[in-house]
Amino acid sequence: SSAASDVYKRQEKGSAIMYSSLDTVWVLLCTALIFFMQAGFAMLETGFTRAKNAGNIIMKNLMDYCIGSVLFWVIGFSFLYGDSIGGFIGTPSLFAAGKFAAAGDLPKRVFLMFATVFCSTATTIVSGAMAGRTKFKAYLTYSAVMSGIVYPITGHWIWNSAGWLKSIGFHDFAGGTAVHVVGGTTALIGALLVGARIGKFDKNGKARAIPGHNLTIGALGIFILSLIHISEPTRLALISY
């Protein structure tokens, strides 16, 4: 009957709204956990380096998010998820204006927050490789370029449905390539450019140990990152499927 059909449609609509709300809550939870990786990186790097570098490292990790997130919101997000130009870069759109199919049924603000913390993670990976060897202003320049250009464009190749790597069947799960390989490769390039730490080698070229100043803080950073990395594939699996 028409009455029964109306009841069924209302129930179906209610279920869809409920599941959509649960998806949103879950993604927000995942966003908070991934954001907390910044604390893990900061503790790890600070504890395993010399005390004189502690303030510099903490500020660099803080600026990775503060500066990086702004640039990602302003232009990087559209480079990553905007309509593809030849499979290499998204159509520029200031402040994530317009619709983005990648968000699916999620509110765009929620999806933007989720994408931003991934960008911050890729940027912060480099900090540890160059800890104690870069000037603060130089690092800020790197952070801006990485967040606004490098990560969004390479991510477009992999995560955008029209990206050139995606179109030939490349599959990235949990950011293994888009976040960790890109961040790790950039860290390697940075380490090669800045060279060894001052005092690392004696006059005969023999390497000398440079112990960290606080192993307790360093260990705390390891535990934070381990917890989040262990749970990361599960979170991404539930979000993706």
Regions found by a protein language model. Name each.
Residues S1-Y8, E232-R235, S240-Y241:
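Short, small-residue-biased leader/transition segments that mark boundaries at the very start
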Residues K13-S231:
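Hydrophobic alpha-helical transmembrane bundles of multi-pass membrane proteins
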